[in-house]
Amino acid sequence: MWTTTSGLSGRSLRLSITFAAVVGFSLFGYNQGMMAGLLNGDEFVNSFPILKMPDNPTAGEKHYIDVIRGAVTSCYELGCFFGALFSMFCGNRLGRTRLIFMGASILIVGALLTTVCYTGKWEVGQFVIGRVVSGIGNGMNTATIPVWQSECSGAHNRGFLVCFEGAMIAGGTFIAYWVVFGISHAADSVQWRFPVALQIFFALVVATGALMLPDSPSWFVSRGLDNEACEVLGKIKGTSPDSDQVLHDFNLIKTDMESTKSEQSNWKTVFTFGKTQEFQRLLIGCSGQFFQQFTGCNAAIYYSTLLFQENLHMEKYLSLIMGGVFASVYALATIPSFFMIERVGRRKLYLIGFLGQGLSFVITFACLIKETEENSKGAAVGIFLFITFFAFTLLPLPWIYPPEINPLRTRTVGASASTCTNWMCNFAVVMFTPLFAGQSPWGVYLFFALFNFVGLIFGYFFYVETAGRELEEVDIIYAKAHVEGKMPFRVAHDLPKLSFEEIVQQSRELGLDTNDHVMLEKKELGLSSDSAQETEEVYEKQ
């Protein structure tokens, strides 16, 4: 079992775990930005002539090349989907760090295949195979890293860390855009091979971190390895394995694990329509990932440089610069989410995001209806406004919301379904965007604008506010809505924050299974978010 900490403990160990996680998510964003810059690179299309758009293409030629471009780009998402599925079925058995090491290793193999593919015979096929293999590795990592980091971190900073991981996706995109721009003057295939190969550096850092850092205490407890769990907890906290602090956290994890086991479910449990509303809550959790993709984020990220050049008719050099500026704005715009996610709340941020993104794309499509130089500038403004709103709203929210909205017994299934929804919708959007943009440069933005407004309506009626709520309170909200015949968001608005005693009382009145002995032990151990934070802050000061 991997309990090694490489001599690190306390703050240094926690920072090392965070660093490895951050690099892993940066790699996710790096690939998005890399392909955005490569697709219109001279040497890239010379190496893969099938991707080169002729000067005066016929409608058939343009359609064919758009299909190939979409397939070459979106095949990565298909690999990610299967990697996430593998993690869902094998993750608990293999462990967090083992799975991350496997994912990083597979990603390295895929990056090598893509980097060294030779031209002249089936070159696109080689490139696609490499991207699919890389995607499998990335899918394994993106499904596992947040769990590993969350289980190794304190209760009070988990929401912040999810936002930080989202910011690092944008950070990876930022790095990729400027790397591609910086090497765009190279006169041979190094112009595209170097950015592709640079993925290997990120993956090596992640793989090294997985080898040198411990698995999560929660995973050890789930496998019955209590001594190892206490050993790792002691290292993370910077104290001895038998200290009061370690025993407190160990008992907390043990209690939560027993609660989860007592609520074990299968897929049949998901299709529950009574007071607990499992199926409705599963769909709501998945809807965030659906709307994240179908409101246009990856259409803008993957194809921004191409859109600047082909749809907005900018010169190639200027389109590369605009792509870099676009990525810089994207990265910087994630910063407000760190402060707003708790203060503003999930529901309001969702609505702000849908409205802002929709209006941004309205500006873009309206400016593209009649193509002029001035209108192109207005269209570019719309794209920049879109990515600004997206960065602090729909980038982090779909990753935070599913674990909060789903009940305990379907939380694992709900999180897995949400992740798979993301990758499948990602694949679909990245595949059809170049086809749609080729047929109607303004129509594609109208399409995404309409989906944003659909999301605004859906979010208003179906998203309840979970910020500051205990997970048991969300169960009460849906049960009260079912009993009283009200919309859950109205119940959540009218229901004040409940104390532990009020949660138990209302759960009994509503006929919910409260698992009293588990809840009492949670209270004793300080498992609620507020008390856990207070306890951890006390220990941090010692």
UniProtKB/Swiss-Prot annotation:
A GO BP annotation: glycerol transmembrane transport
**Keywords carried by this UniProt record:** Membrane, Transmembrane, Transmembrane helix, Transport
What does UniProt give as GO cellular component? Answer: membrane
Q: Which SUPFAM superfamilies match?
A: MFS general substrate transporter
Q: What induces it?
A: Expression is induced upon voriconazole treatment. Expression is up-regulated by exposure to human monocyte-derived immature dendritic cells. Expression is also up-regulated in conidia exposed to human neutrophils.
Query: Which segments does the entry list as coiled coil?
Result: none
Stated membrane topology is:
Multi-pass membrane protein
Q: Where in the cell is it found?
A: Membrane
TM region positions? 19-39, 70-90, 99-119, 127-149, 160-180, 194-214, 321-341, 349-369, 380-400, 413-432, 444-464
Q: Does the keyword Nuclease apply?
A: no
Transmembrane helix recorded as keyword? yes
- InterPro entries tied to this protein: MFS_dom, MFS_sugar_transport-like, MFS_Sugar_Transporters, MFS_trans_sf, Sugar/inositol_transpt, Sugar_transporter_CS
- What GO molecular function annotation could you give as one example from this UniProt entry? carbohydrate:proton symporter activity
User: What's its job?
Assistant: Major facilitator superfamily transporter that may be involved in A.fumigatus adaptation to azoles such as vorizonazole.
Protein family: Belongs to the major facilitator superfamily. Sugar transporter (TC 2.A.1.1) family.
Extract the PANTHER family matched here.
PLASTIDIC GLUCOSE TRANSPORTER 4, SUGAR TRANSPORTER STL1
**What's the protein here called?**
Major facilitator superfamily transporter mfsA
Species per Swiss-Prot/TrEMBL record: Aspergillus fumigatus (strain ATCC MYA-4609 / CBS 101355 / FGSC A1100 / Af293) (Neosartorya fumigata)
Query: What would be the name of the gene that encodes this protein?
Result: mfsA
